[in-house]
Amino acid sequence: MSRLGIMVLTLLLLVYMATSHQDAGEKQATQRDAINFRWKRSLTRRTATEECEESCEEEEKTCCGEXDGEPVCARFCLG
C-alpha cells in the first residue's frame, strides 16, 4: 500500500474515533440530565406533600392530594 493510502486510512480512523467519542459524551449528558430532572421532580413532590399534610393537619383531616395547586383535605381519602 502506498503512503498516501496509509495516510488516508489513518485519517479516516482518527475521524471515526473523534466522532464516536463525541456521541458518547452526548449520550452521557442526556442520561445525566434525565437523572437530574427526576431528582428535582421528587424533591418538588416531597415538599408539596409536606405542605398538604401540614395544611390538613390544622383542620384535623387527612391530605388526599392536590387539585389546582390547592391541598385536598378530607376525613377519609377515596381512591
Swiss-Prot record:
The protein's location, in the record's own words, is:
Secreted
Tissue expression summary: Expressed by the venom duct.
Gene Ontology terms: cellular component: extracellular region
Which residues form the pro-region? 21-44
**Per the annotation, which location comes first and is thus the protein's main one?**
secreted
Secreted listed as a keyword: yes
Question: Which keywords belong to this entry?
Answer: Amidation, Cleavage on pair of basic residues, Disulfide bond, Knottin, Neurotoxin, Secreted, Signal, Toxin
| Signal sequence interval, chain numbering | 1-20
Q: Which residues carry this modification: Leucine amide?
A: L78
Q: Which GO terms describe its molecular function?
A: ion channel inhibitor activity; toxin activity
- What parts of the sequence cross the membrane? none
Q: Which InterPro entries match?
A: Conotoxin
Which cysteines form disulfides? C52-C64, C56-C73, C63-C77
Q: Which family does it belong to?
A: Belongs to the conotoxin O3 superfamily.
Relay the domain remarks. Answer: The presence of a 'disulfide through disulfide knot' structurally defines this protein as a knottin. The cysteine framework is VI/VII (C-C-CC-C-C).
Protein's name according to its UniProt entry:
Conotoxin ArMSGL-0124
